[in-house]
Amino acid sequence: MEISKQTSDLLLSLEKKKGTLPKFSVLRSIPRNRIIYGAPGTGKSNYLEREVGKIFGDNPYVFTRVTFFPGYTYGQFIGAYKPVPIYKKLSGEEEIFSSNFRDKMENFEPMIDYQFVPGPFIDVLIKALKNRYTNFILIIEEINRANAASVFGDIFQLLDRNKNGESDYPVTFGPDIMNYLARNGIKDEMIKLPSNFFIWATMNNADQGVLPLDTAFKRRWSFEYLELEKYRKAVDSWKLSLRYKGHNKVIMWNDFRDIINKRLKGKVPEDKLLGPFFLKESELWNQNVFKNKLLYYLKEDVFKHNPTIDFLNASTFSELIEKYDGSDNIFTFDIDDSSFVSD
């Protein structure tokens, strides 16, 4: 059975919406595989977004974003066979419409077909191979929240790039992927990542639930550490509302972070410190967010594995919240009155 001409025309019109693609080269010195890492709230995603804008422009067709999470799989990232709804005319004519047909489906019989559905990696790969003079980027947020080596699977070998930015070693995918590539105009028997295919990611070492990247996997990436205070000036005017010894107080967000970070430096890894964007500006006046996000992070993520550090005046999180809501100082040190400001 063949897809109708109406559907084909619709898909063609959607393809044309990508507009005129920018055609320019990127310096070889800019890494094709890149991981930005740093403490929570340092602005890794913001930094990556700025870098993407400077290098790749603002055409949404050239970049794709995906977030890894526990349980994220090869099939989701690369692609897999899935049930796909299609529609047949009730008139009995052998005319089939795909699920991409967006008009109202009246007088059509729904059917289920099984097709290879590409993941974000294959989508970007096809774009890059068919538009060699345009740069494409796949952004992976939180790459170490999933088992990255398992998610990448057989494309792991493609991450080895030569000085021109192309894969050193080609691979042959399974028949389902190779057939899909062929149907989309990619008929090579062996596949390499072209130099115009960039893969950039963010990584947070400090969070619980993240998985370590093995040495062989890390070797294929360029790592860039984002300094804790790189975007300090961006939050200079932010103020934090908190209860201190039974009174509602206001303190500059950067001053509060300095108080916390200075007492933690040298006692915990640097990626456990508070970055400028650990809290959003809109969250700084929300007491529930302060308690359940910032205090919880300090108690459960920072001090749970460092119980000997003299910092919080509570042995459990519930005790910490009770003291915060009451009139006690939750810290084992005093905050100087001169640190507080008017709201």
UniProtKB/Swiss-Prot annotation:
Molecular functions (GO terms): ATP binding; ATP hydrolysis activity; type II site-specific deoxyribonuclease activity
Described purpose of this protein according to its UniProt entry: A P subtype restriction enzyme that recognizes the double-stranded sequence 5'-CTCGAG-3'; the cleavage site is unknown.
Domain of life from the UniProt record: Bacteria
Organism, scientific name: Bacillus subtilis (strain 168)
Classification via Pfam families: AAA_5
Disruption of the gene: reported phenotype: Not essential; its disruption results in increased transformation by plasmid DNA carrying multiple BsuMI target sequences. Triple deletion ydiO-ydiP-ydiS leads to loss of susceptibility to MspJI, which only digests C-methylated DNA.
Name under which the protein is recorded: Type II restriction enzyme BsuMI component YdiS
This protein's UniProt keywords: Endonuclease, Hydrolase, Nuclease, Restriction system
Coiled-coil annotated residue ranges, if any: none
Factors inducing expression: Constitutively expressed during exponential growth. Encoded in an operon with ydiR and ydjA.
E.C. number: 3.1.21.4
GO terms of biological process kind: DNA restriction-modification system
Subunit details: BsuMI restriction activity requires YdiR, YdiS and YdjA.
Known catalytic reactions: Endonucleolytic cleavage of DNA to give specific double-stranded fragments with terminal 5'-phosphates
